[in-house]
Design a protein with these regions (language model features):
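Contiguous, often N-terminal, cationic amphipathic patches that form binding interfaces
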Residues: 1-55, 63-65, 69-74, 79-97
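Alpha-helical residues within the helix-turn-helix
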Residues: 59
Length: 97
């Protein structure tokens, strides 16, 4: 089954994620439909979960935090991230799954 939660768009990468804030530990759970499912320790208060997501993704992918941007979903569990990186879609999938 092919999921398109990660794709190239105009020279950058876009990743669709489904976030579960307030978890015991931050981790990638797997694929959920057309999104990557991620549990985060941070609570969904005052943008803390969004900040934690950017830190988590940047560490997993080995990119700078400023290269990860939240495009959509500031107040939703469904989010779209844009990553400025030379990584391929296959490399991103390998590092996150």
């Amino acid at each position: 089954m092919t999921h398109d939660w990660c794709h190239r768009h105009a020279g950058s990468l876009r990743i669709a994620v489904h976030v579960q804030p307030g978890a015991r530990v931050s981790e990638v759970v797997g694929e959920s439909g057309d999104a990557l499912k991620i549990r985060l320790q941070a609570p969904p208060v005052d943008g803390k979960a969004n900040e934690a997501l950017i830190v988590f993704i940047s560490e997993k992918l080995g990119v700078r935090q400023r290269d990860v941007r939240l495009l959509r979903g500031q107040t939703s569990r469904q989010k779209l991230l844009e990553i400025e990186s030379g990584l391929s879609v296959e490399e991103v999938r390998a590092r996150l799954l």
